[in-house]
């Protein structure tokens, strides 16, 4: 019994010590991150870089371990990114915007907000250019708001329309003998469909084609307007898969 108590209290003491050390380490990281924050001086003829590989979330995202890794940069929220573009339009030290348009990690809604902000920025008569090596469709859609778009000659250019894919779990659930309790009303209520069907129902196919087609039509119209092209020409290029490389 005495040996058990000795081991127990020794383990408890070790746990307390490690907990206290952990708290001090976290506090130290916070203090270090706070002390590393400083104002950045912007020189004349500065260029605002919009990197589409950065996901602009709805809320501001901070890296709590940035002080340890040496990378204390924070990712601005979507609202902050839009405000930065708006501020750059009136900042005399900012000459223009450079868009890195390889892979756009932002959703359609965020992409639309950024694109709208860029179109407003262009009214300031400052330049907006975009460049990419492997350019995907949603990235080009945003970049179509730029004055000039450049693609690496040996790179890749994707242009093939829009599509959606759904994963169905009913077959797996049946094999595991799991019966989910699902409640829905109406044939167009498709949120629970992956758990009660093995393929898309006709109703879901119809509604998906409607909203996806509407989204695609809007995208084509805005790209055509920005690049001075015809929507029927863009649709034909996508349907035939005629564009695979920048040379195409």
Question: Language model features by range: what are they?
Answer:
Residues 2-231, 235-243:
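Small-residue-centered hinge/linker elements
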Residues 247-248:
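Long, low-complexity segments enriched in small/aliphatic residues
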């Amino acid at each position: 019994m005495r040996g058990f108590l000795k081991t127990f209290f020794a383990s408890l003491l070790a746990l307390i010590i490690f907990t206290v050390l952990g708290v001090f380490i976290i506090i130290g990281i916070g203090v270090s991150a706070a002390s590393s924050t400083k104002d950045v001086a912007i020189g004349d003829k500065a260029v605002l870089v919009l990197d589409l590989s950065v996901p602009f979330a709805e809320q501001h995202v901070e890296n709590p371990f940035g002080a340890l890794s040496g990378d204390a940069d924070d990712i601005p929220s979507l609202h902050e990114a839009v405000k930065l573009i708006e501020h750059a339009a009136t900042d005399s030290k900012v000459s223009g915007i450079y868009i890195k348009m390889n892979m756009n990690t932002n959703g359609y809604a965020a992409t639309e907000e950024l694109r709208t902000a860029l179109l407003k920025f262009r009214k300031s008569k400052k330049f907006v250019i975009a460049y990419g090596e492997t350019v995907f469709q949603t990235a080009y859609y945003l970049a179509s708001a730029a004055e000039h778009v450049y693609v690496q000659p040996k790179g890749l250019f994707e242009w093939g329309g829009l599509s959606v894919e759904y994963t169905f779990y009913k077959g797996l659930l049946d094999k595991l003998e799991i019966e989910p309790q699902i409640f829905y009303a109406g044939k167009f209520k498709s949120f629970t469909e992956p758990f009660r069907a093995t393929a898309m129902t006709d109703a879901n196919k119809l509604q998906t084609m409607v909203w996806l087609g509407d989204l695609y039509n809007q995208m084509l119209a805005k790209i055509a307007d920005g690049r001075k092209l015809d929507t029927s020409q863009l649709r034909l290029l996508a349907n035939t898969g005629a564009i695979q490389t920048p040379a195409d």
